[in-house]
């Protein structure tokens, strides 16, 4: 039965291995910026496109693999769609064997694009059915602090701090801002009440 659905043992499977790692992110840590729809779909499509191009133009598979993964990371970073399993997508495009090589740029759309889209739709359905917000949106506190107790960090100041930090962190800017404001509010309450924990 599986042979009828999948085709012969030599045919390209409808699912590629990097999608297992994508599934871990989408279902296990759906709030991560690395697991958002743009990250999985954009990251995987970009990586597949770069991987196929590297495989086509670079004769050495080892060099093509290194170029594909490195270039995919650079482009994903610039497009703000970093998705770690996409590195494996780029690698699969280069080292996946004759069936994947025969697909050429078709590999970008099927299986990569199709797998990414179906996995994202599945994550939306599952996470929202189980009460988890996906795609993730920053939490807004239910009881904002009164104006007198609030300390502020402007969006520009937060952007400056993140730029000075110089590294990518696995939390969205909006979530970080909400957490920071919550921490400032609690610190202010401790100051006003004289309570130190």
Predicted regions and their residues:
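Hydrophobic alpha-helical transmembrane segments and immediately flanking/interface helices
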Residues: 85, 176-197
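Membrane-helix interface "capping/anchor" motifs
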Residues: 30-39, 76-87
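Subset of alpha-helical transmembrane segments and adjacent helix-loop junctions
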Residues: 56-67, 82-89
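Alpha-helical transmembrane segments and their membrane-interface boundaries
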Residues: 1-50, 59-66, 104-109, 113, ...
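Short, surface-exposed acidic
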Residues: 169-176
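Anion-binding (especially nucleotide phosphate/pyrophosphate-binding) glycine-rich loop
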Residues: 60, 71, 75
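Generic transmembrane alpha-helix signature in multi-pass membrane proteins
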Residues: 24-26, 51-55, 76, 90-95
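Transmembrane helix-loop junctions at the membrane interface of multipass transporters and ion channels
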Residues: 90-107
């Amino acid at each position: 039965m599986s042979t009828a659905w999948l085709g012969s043992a030599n045919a390209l499977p409808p699912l590629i291995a990097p999608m297992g790692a994508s599934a871990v992110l989408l279902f296990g840590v759906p709030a991560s910026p690395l697991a958002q729809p743009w990250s999985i779909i954009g990251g995987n499509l970009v990586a597949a496109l770069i991987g196929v191009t590297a495989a086509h133009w670079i004769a050495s598979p080892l060099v093509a693999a290194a170029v594909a993964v490195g270039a995919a990371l650079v482009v994903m970073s610039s497009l703000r769609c970093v998705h770690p399993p996409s590195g494996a997508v780029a690698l699969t495009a280069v080292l996946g064997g004759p069936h994947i090589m025969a697909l050429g740029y078709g590999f970008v759309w099927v299986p990569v694009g199709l797998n990414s889209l179906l996995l994202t739709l599945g994550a939306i359905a599952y996470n929202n059915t189980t009460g988890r917000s996906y795609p993730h949106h920053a939490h807004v506190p239910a009881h904002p602090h009164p104006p007198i107790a609030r300390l502020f960090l402007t969006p520009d100041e937060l952007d400056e701090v993140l730029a000075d930090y110089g590294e990518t962190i696995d939390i969205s800017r909006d979530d970080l801002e909400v957490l920071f404001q919550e921490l400032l509010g609690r610190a202010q309450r401790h100051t006003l009440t004289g309570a130190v924990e």
